[in-house]
Every structure is written in C-alpha cells, then in structure tokens.
Design a protein with these regions (language model features):
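Gly/Ser-rich "nucleophile elbow"/oxyanion-hole loop immediately N-terminal to the catalytic nucleophile
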Residues: 5-40
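Short, proline-enriched alpha-helix->beta-strand connector loops that line the catalytic pocket
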Residues: 75-81
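C-terminal catalytic histidine-bearing segment of alpha/beta-hydrolase fold enzymes
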Residues: 84, 90, 109-168
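Alpha/beta-hydrolase-fold catalytic nucleophile elbow
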Residues: 37, 62-64, 84
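Short alpha-helix in the alpha/beta-hydrolase fold that links the catalytic acid
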Residues: 92-110
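A conserved short beta-strand
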Residues: 55-67
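Short glycine-enriched nucleophile-adjacent loop
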Residues: 43-54
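Alpha-helical scaffolding within the catalytic cores
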Residues: 18-19, 44, 64-74
Length: 168
C-alpha cells in the first residue's frame, strides 16, 4: 500500500511508518515478511522511514533515489537493502547510489557483520544504457528505472529475506 508524500522529510517518513503499523495491527500479516520500496522522492522518504524503524522491515528496495536516512540502525537491525540506480540517472546520478551502498557497507562492518553476511543483505545494481535498451528504455533513465519493479531476480532477492534470517 503506497503512502502519498506530505513532504520529503520526517513527516512523510513517520506517516509511512504509521501506515505499516496500521496494517500490522489490523490485518493478518507475517511480521517477519514486511517489505518496503521507495522510488525517487519516495526513496528519500522510505530510506528515512526504514532507518527510523528498521525493526519493522525484513528488506527494502531503494530505487533511483538518494539515501536520506541513517545507516547504523539498518545494520544494527539486519534489514536487507537492494539499491538500484541507472548508471546514467539524470536526476540523482549513480554516485549517490554508490555512496549509500558504501555507507551501509561500513555500517554493517561496524556492527560486526562479516563480508559474506553483508553480501547476503546488501546489494547494488547500477545498470548501463544497454541494459535499459534491452528493456525498451533508451532515454530518461531516471524515470525508466521503474523497470526494476518488473525484474524477477531483484524482487525475488527482496522477498527471500525474513526478519529472523537477517539478524546477525
């Protein structure tokens, strides 16, 4: 269930958390299999929400966005993160994805995770123009990045994680 942005800051992040909590309280939900995804501005918000309450989420798909949340809480709670950004994203640029990846990797190391454990819970993909062309996207790589939500390997990776499994 998508939340609509009120802002790109704490207000929307807290509303996303409240929506998650509402579903957990009012529907039959496997609490070990709660997932989040954020794309573009929604990724800025969801990176904040997931870092504010990483205990709620087994995995998070961070698409075509910059990371505005904290890093340490993600690692401390073992939340799996898949970062996806076009190599030539016109809006954010792929360097922001790599910066988030490196900061999350450092946070996992500081939390005592081994390299093998980290590789199981942290992934990044920054596909090139040819990868997008094979999927019918030949320009506007930022907007075209939404093809990630149709990539079975990415979605299966996210859905393969459970809260108990991720805890080190």
């Amino acid at each position: 269930m998508p939340a609509q942005l009120t802002d790109w800051h704490d207000t929307s992040a807290r509303q996303a958390i409240e929506l998650t909590e509402y579903f957990l309280a009012n529907f039959s939900v496997d609490v070990s299999r709660v997932y989040a995804a954020g794309y573009s501005a929604g990724g800025e918000t969801m990176s904040q929400a997931v870092s504010m309450r990483p205990d709620l989420y087994a995995a998070y798909l961070h698409g075509a966005s910059q990371w505005d949340g904290d890093y340490a809480p993600i690692a401390e709670n073992g939340t799996a993160v898949y970062i996806f950004m076009a190599e030539h994203d016109e809006y954010y640029g792929s360097q922001r994805a790599w910066s988030a990846y490196n900061s999350l990797h450092d946070a996992y190391e500081e939390a005592g995770w081994s390299e093998e454990q980290i590789s199981n819970v942290l992934q990044i993909q920054t596909p090139n123009d040819e990868w997008f062309a094979q999927r019918g996207v030949t320009s506007n790589y930022h907007g075209g990045g939404n093809v990630v939500f149709g990539e079975d390997d990415v979605l299966n990776w996210v859905l393969s994680h459970t809260k108990e499994e991720n805890e080190s």
